[in-house]
Amino acid sequence: ARRQRQMCIRDSYIYAFVQAVRTVAPWAGVPVIVLLSTTIGLIAPGFHLALIPIATASLTAVGYDDLINIWFFCCTITPGFISLAVMLRTKKPLLRQTALSCCLSALLGGISEPTTYGICYKMVKPYYAYLITALSTAVLAGLLHLKCYAFGGYSLTNILLYLGPSLDYANFRNALLLVGFMLIMSFITVNLIGFDDSCYEETAVAAADKAE
């Protein structure tokens, strides 16, 4: 119970800070929360769950969410493309197989954890590519005032949520442009930064030895 109270207090401070930033610079809310989730989130995972009601309240009040879903959009689709870039660059069969499943989980299922824990944290350098891409996308999303018209707009299968019931074609176009930006930036950053995939070779050898 004490830990839960501490987490609630932490989440309240995070939300208050993000709201204060948005008061001064409305476009900066998304990049700030992306930065917090990719830094503080490393040692305090799960704080995003407490912020979901913010999106629900925004959808009820104004008909769209321009913060929480956009944050998820940047930090879920980006890992999918990071995995795709890793899969096409590596020569390790085990990593290719892992990256493919991670890519599909993120892009089609809206689940980023396989990429985060199975690729980014394990090899470290892809995490830097992920951070650069997600943060730069968040800045653009904030400047374009990207809006999601229902909860769940953080996978390619739900991209139509950016069109909305009133057919906001400009917003939908911006969402598609940002998806393209994440794709290009993911490939550029992964290939420029590189990665050491030797750990997957060791994992494959250990698995083979265990099978014997």
Segments the model singles out, each with a brief description of its role:
Residues Q4-I9:
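Short, small-residue-biased leader/transition segments that mark boundaries at the very start
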Residues R10-A25, A55-L59, C103, C120:
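Hydrophobic alpha-helical segments of integral membrane proteins
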Residues I14, T38, L42, G46, ...:
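Alpha-helical membrane-inserting segments
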Residues V21-V34, G63-W71, Y169-R173:
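Membrane-interfacial loop-to-helix junctions in multi-pass transporters
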Residues L35-H48, L59-G63, A106-G109, A141:
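Transmembrane alpha-helix interface/packing and boundary motifs in multi-pass membrane proteins
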Residues F47, L51-A55, C75-I82, L104-G109, ...:
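Pore- and pathway-forming membrane helices of multi-pass small-molecule/ion transporters and channels
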Residues T56-A134:
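Helix-loop-helix junctions within the multi-pass membrane cores of secondary transporters/permeases
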Residues P114-E212:
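Transmembrane alpha-helical segments and their short flanking loops
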